[in-house]
Amino acid sequence: MIPFSLKNGTLCVEDIPLPEIAAQYGTPCYVYSHSYLTERARRFTKALDGAGKGKSLVAFAVKANPSQAILASFAKEGLGADVVSAGEIRRAVHAGIPPERIVFSGVGKTAEEMRYALEIGIGQFNIESVSEIEMLAEVATSLGKKAAVALRINPDVDPHTHAKIATGKADTKFGIAAEDALSAYEKLASYPSLKIQGIASHIGSQITDLAPFEAAAERIYEIITALEKAGHAIETADLGGGLGVRYKDDQPEPPSVEAYGEMIKRVTKGWNCRLIFEPGRSLIANAGVLLSKVIRIKESKTARFVILDAAMNDLVRPTLYDAYHEIKAVTPSAQTYQADIVGPVCETGDIFARNRSISAVKADDLMAIMSAGAYGATMASAYNSRPLVAEVMVSGNKSALIRKRQSVEDLMRDEQKVEWL
């Protein structure tokens, strides 16, 4: 489905015109299409049906968007959760995702986080170093529990994506080098409190070519074969996530979920293990927009600035990654002009688009920053003492506030008065 479309000259989310959302909930706010995200979950699950041994686990990467409403929607679709902190575990469980469908990744798990994960019975730890093996063994022993473990292997595959979101090359902090895999598994097998359950890999995010995924999977299977010859049974293979989405209207469509699924089935044919996947962006990015109002138009000798009430603290991707987002007038006109689209934060880097051709908006017009469902609200901050914005979910002609707008009082609530100041 198409979650955002023009109807009678106005951009709508499903069946609701975005001006109605702005009038009811204010701006800026994030707006999500429930129908789209559930459709994506179903397509992903269906595309991977029959891959590997038994039913694959699709574990949503919670870091992409940890909203309780979104996690609850995915829980109802049978998805699990890929998490990287105890906080994300708590969010997933609170939203209804069973602990056994949770995979705990990340290079910096603390003993306290491991303890909590063991106590609630998560499905798998993806361990990324020998020292982490040692820590988990100690924690599991202290609790009298046995931890199910996969080692994350770094396959040294170039995913051809932005350097800051490439995770499968040898020079990144992630995973254990492929040449060290066998010795790491021998170390893992030496601890009675740890169970060898599987192997894991994740090469990056926003990948728009299937070849790196295929190369990584083939490398992982080579290691699985070597491990099995050494007497280590591998029950699960976590192939990570990273499938990209289209951010620019004039870009070619990236590989579909179905094409990805066909490639996975072909490459993993004959694998005697259950497969796990960690999609994030590909499920949620195009389900959301950041809805904003034009504060004013500023003209200078060198540029025209469209100043929005949204800022880099609300959506940091353009500042952090030079990421491109389509930015559309909610009620577009035939007239266009070139402009820099910026926010009110006191940073030159507070810019969403530079020298962009857009509908000739004016003060109080609404604009939608598209494809903002992933790594948007989750990466927001209160910089310049700007409260976090509201989040809204839409299904058909129904809408609901899923996170209220913060107030400045909310920002100051946890601060403490110091008597001697």
From Swiss-Prot:
UniProt xrefs under Gene3D superfamilies: Alanine racemase, Lyase, Ornithine Decarboxylase, Chain A, domain 1
Residue positions of the active site: 346
Binding site for pyridoxal 5'-phosphate: 242, 278-281, 375
Superkingdom classification of source: Bacteria
A molecular function (GO) term: diaminopimelate decarboxylase activity
Family under the similarity heading: Belongs to the Orn/Lys/Arg decarboxylase class-II family. LysA subfamily.
Protein name: Diaminopimelate decarboxylase
Gene, per the UniProt record: lysA
